Regions:
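Conserved donor nucleotide-binding strand/loop of the catalytic core
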Residues: 46-64, 139
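Cell-envelope/extracellular polymer assembly enzymes that use nucleotide-activated donors
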Residues: 1-2
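Catalytic-site signature of metal-activated, phosphate-bearing donor transferases
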Residues: 63-68, 92-228
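Short beta-strand-to-loop acidic/aromatic patch adjacent to the donor-nucleotide binding site
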Residues: 78-91
């Protein structure tokens, strides 16, 4: 199993991401594509024995570069791979894949919501259903020729021996961690949107005003159900 992720200033989430997948796949290789983080992301990746690959977009958030990486980073592998953002935790184990005949894992995803006003990731137990995150995170690279992710990897048009698992595995997207943290992250990403992203409408939600972000968070908290 090889796991690929893309990071920019993910010092909060990256340790949890690595621990989550190493627990499920003890011998996995984790490859971190880092977009020149300015916090401790790079040190964390190297300190936790990940392969670190740095790429530059001139300090701009570039969805086209993001897609180029995710559509190609796994090529050349002959086993299962996971391609996920640092806040996307697929709940699947090594034993689940040992006898899986399908080439792509089916997913039922939830946006995780912190009911408390803290940054305790392990304490987040609630979520709201999010069909847009039913992504093709996990697939068998020996059977898939191209994954052909679309914008944000929310859709894909794979080629090769394409078959989806009958069982759906839960994916947890840690979106609503903390109101202040979410507002601050949105502001950072809004300031980094490339001209291409702006013209194509990619990442438009990052430009939402703080009050709108807060209300979105509180609505999610109100509707969240216990998952863990």
């Amino acid at each position: 199993m090889t796991i690929y992720t893309i990071t920019y200033n993910e010092e909060l989430m990256l340790p949890y991401f690595i621990e989550h997948y190493r627990k499920r796949f003890p011998n996995c290789k984790i490859v971190v594509y880092d977009n020149e983080s300015t916090d401790d992301t790079r040190a964390i990746a190297m300190g936790m024995d990940c392969e670190l690959i740095t790429y530059s977009t001139n300090n701009k958030l570039s969805d086209s570069t993001y897609l180029e990486i995710k559509n190609n980073c796994w090529k050349g592998q002959n086993d299962w791979v996971i391609v996920a953002d640092c806040d996307e935790f697929l709940d699947i184990w090594e034993s689940d894949l040992e006898n899986e005949q399908a080439s792509i894992i089916s997913v039922e995803a939830y946006n995780m919501v912190n009911i408390e006003d803290n940054l305790d990731i392990y304490g987040i137990t609630h979520g709201v259903r999010s069909t847009s995150y039913d992504k093709a995170y996990c697939f068998n690279a020996s059977k898939i020729h191209k994954i052909n992710y679309g914008a944000g990897c929310h859709s894909c048009s794979p080629t090769g021996q394409v078959s989806y698992s009958k069982k759906k595995y839960e994916a947890r997207h840690y979106k609503y961690i903390n109101i202040d943290y979410m507002i601050a992250r949105h502001a950072i990403f809004a300031s980094r949107r490339s001209e291409e992203n702006i013209q194509r409408g990619f990442g438009a939600h990052y430009a939402y005003p703080p009050e709108q972000i807060k209300q979105e968070f509180l609505t999610a908290r109100k509707n969240a159900i216990k998952l863990l």
